[in-house]
Amino acid sequence: MIFVIESKLLQIYRNRNRNINFYTTMDNIMSAEYYLSLYAKYNSKNLDVFRNMLQAIEPSGNNYHILHAYCGIKGLDERFVEELLHRGYSPNETDDDGNYPLHIASKINNNRIVAMLLTHGADPNACDKHNKTPLYYLSGTDDEVIERINLLVQYGAKINNSVDEEGCGPLLACTDPSERVFKKIMSIGFEARIVDKFGKNHIHRHLMSDNPKASTISWMMKLGISPSKPDHDGNTPLHIVCSKTVKNVDIIDLLLPSTDVNKQNKFGDSPLTLLIKTLSPAHLINKLLSTSNVITDQTVNICIFYDRDDVLEIINDKGKQYDSTDFKMAVEVGSIRCVKYLLDNDIICEDAMYYAVLSEYETMVDYLLFNHFSVDFVVNGHTCMSECVRLNNPVILSKLMLHNPTSETMYLTMKAIEKDRLDKSIIIPFIAYFVLMHPDFCKNRRYFTSYKRFVTDYVHEGVSYEVFDDYF
């Protein structure tokens, strides 16, 4: 295949030297560049063969981007690039992706090609489509990266005068640097105490990398980078590490002394609440709690919402007292574990059943019924049964009716349903059965009158109501 490509290029070269019109010549040049671009894809390349091929080539400005293609070959002998540069290919033209040859060579860590391009006039301050100069691309070993930094700076790379799309300079964009590289970049004049357009400093950004390390953060702190600075959303580095699914305890230990664990971001989250929300182990949460003199109500509420009875116990051991409001919230959010913990510690809310009904947590209703919570509590004129009607929930209604509400409760239930003009259809059978099982109900004029009106207002007008004539 290489022989075929070489033959094609030789034929194009011969045709170019004959008496051929301009358009045919341009077609030949474009064809030659096409075959040269194919040659770039072969693993085995011969410099002499390459030089022969170049005899048929003149830079055409077409979309083959020959110089870019060869600069992107790992381990390529820089003499191939040198031949292209001597042939007239410009090191300061972009390909279709907005990359310069110098950016491409920097990305693949080919310092010899970087040096070759720079000596032939490549602009070390040119920006790609991400607004990054070659200094942003610092892959490779420490020695290779430092060598490339020296090359770029030697040929005029400017310091601290460029930012990429995220508002980062080259130093800030390097999210996982080695200590040697970081110090080298700083030694040539880069400013360490800077932030990106989101207000994140080097520690923030390192924590967002794939493999953040406590050792890296430690020497960043020694270089004067703040471990407690909040970004524009109010997140400190500790917020970030606490929000991750996998927690790095060494990093948490490193950041804890300098950060208030109750400091809230603009979304109302603190490092402590983020640990709770991400279902972190209790011992890790205890580590943060041990640094705080104040345990906020928000922390307790988050524990309840996420059903963390284990954390409630830790908080209680630190002196935090719970009350009926906490029990009520646990019922409302369906936190069975927290309800059980509070109940075991004699913390209750007498009208808990009412709020369990409002939340429509059947399991919570069952748990409260099992623990003998009353179905007779009335809140603002509404009963547990009237709220079942409002919610159109016959399942919970049937559970409550099986636990013997009082006659007064049923009277108030009917009053609430009529007052709010609720649909009576789901409760009529339950009330009828209740009256049947509680004959004393109809011996009370107030109860009986209300019941008669409640039923007759619902049943069709043509129905006889003589069944009620025996009373009063």
UniProtKB/Swiss-Prot annotation:
| Lineage of the species this protein comes from | Viruses, Varidnaviria, Bamfordvirae, Nucleocytoviricota, Pokkesviricetes
Give the induction annotation.
Answer: Expressed in the early phase of the viral replicative cycle.
Q: What does this protein do?
A: Inhibits host apoptosis. Acts by associating with host apoptosome.
Classification via SUPFAM superfamilies: Ankyrin repeat
Compartments where located: Host cytoplasm
* Name used for this protein in its record: Inhibitor of Apoptosis OPG037
Q: Which InterPro entries match?
A: Ankyrin_rpt, Ankyrin_rpt-contain_sf
Which regions does the record annotate with the repeat ANK? Answer: 97-126, 130-161, 233-263, 267-297, 322-351, 353-377
